[in-house]
């Protein structure tokens, strides 16, 4: 008997008694009795039980009675064969009910509904735990936040989100997890077990429920509704995170700056902004990212994959969130509203950017000239004016540009010239005028051979008293480089009189192939601006009428801007005078009429270097 006991205990079952339950020493699962714990332990390979577990085995059971009573059953169950194999994955089971229960993880079947709320579950034990939440039986409460759970294991998993503990590390890729079920699901991805494929985009998943969640991104189904604001979601986890916003719960707080977050992933991405860590490296271009979502989005840009298509207009998108935002263009839904001027927005970041207009905050300041900006991206573009950096290069001719939009406009000229065989148009650099002192006191040096002496002041939106600053080689500095075409041939005859600077007017512009088609009458236009101007002649393309004067508009934004003319709302105020305006663009135009205070330092060296001009302008 002593030899048999030693033989039975020498391998050591990978479980121990913990209170009134039996706990697996490999994955921390618990079971109500020893036979069930033993059956579960057999699912782990012998290598799963480490030497430390085997050494601790003689101390596991402190109650000899339970060990004696279950010893024979344990050894018998471990040695029992597994004749019931899953056809979809390598797992095998001893009994048919166990195989049927496992099969639900593949089929997504949830035959156990909750009589209170209708939520369904795969296993009866999960339903029992859920019913305890309806009865208010949540004895395990988190010490970090107000959440409570029906089981101790769920509480421990939740608390790891606060402590950052992730004890389950993947041996293949090093990724770690707090939840053992998520860890097991991740291991399947390395095994290549993804039997469920999306018929639309081909993306494959290890479980059917994940495929069902993914399919909602194509169909637009959002069955999880917020009872507070009516917003709907495609996943229950997204609804849970959203509800924290209403409850003002931000359980994940940054110790460095105090900022709170509703999701652990958002908190972890934020932490990298302090450390500067960018662990996600693109193998194609070497660019690095701090969060996985930006990295995946960047990879799709390389692959050109846009699997999410709008069913109304056929436009494709890389992200389901981009598709959901695009759908609001068709529905007119603008859920984000400014509390100060009642302006509404399609996206939350548009509202945040708009809020800076009212607050006047411009936290991003240029170290060279002191100019401040509301957004970091605007400061980055502005800084290129000082550094001369032009990171966007044309592959056809080698020209470089400050911003991506200018490169795209320039590339259209190559596409049109390939069709007509015409030479590229001369580009004019327009935008920000240099101070009058560069070219003389209020006088403009005319461009040689050009009859455009009176044009620049009006073209640039400058006040008449500025004298219309123009100099040789177009001594005007531009934030972007754009093609300038005369839309009205009779005004000034500027394009046709440029002479050697490039014949951009006359017959050459007429020979351009049309690119933009009117959706109503099919008439074609060479530029988007001309198309939009033409579409105003079609009443059916202006479906948004003003209820007060009957004037109609092609989009809702135009109607909202027009409606302010009937009311006294002028949300954009000038900081230098009492005037207020209906739109931010009107305010910016007005601000140019205020003279720059004498003594304001304006660095000219980077601007001169950008244009390649001599330091002293010719008078």
From Swiss-Prot:
Protein name, UniProt field: Zinc finger protein 668
Cross-link (Glycyl lysine isopeptide (Lys-Gly) (interchain with G-Cter in SUMO2)): 59, 65, 80, 154, 512
InterPro entries reported in the protein's UniProt record: Znf_C2H2_sf (IPR036236), Znf_C2H2_type (IPR013087)
Zinc finger (C2H2-type): 22-44, 84-106, 112-134, 140-162, 168-190, 196-218, 224-246, 252-274, 280-302, 308-330, 336-358, 364-386, 392-414, 516-538, 544-566, 572-594
Keyword Zinc annotated: yes
rRNA processing among keywords: no
Family: Belongs to the krueppel C2H2-type zinc-finger protein family.
GO cellular component, one term: nucleus
Function per UniProt: May be involved in transcriptional regulation. May play a role in DNA repair process.
Chain positions found as Phosphoserine: 10, 387
GO biological process assignments: DNA repair; negative regulation of transcription by RNA polymerase II
Annotated keywords: Acetylation, DNA-binding, Isopeptide bond, Metal-binding, Nucleus, Phosphoprotein, Repeat, Transcription, Transcription regulation, Ubl conjugation, Zinc, Zinc-finger
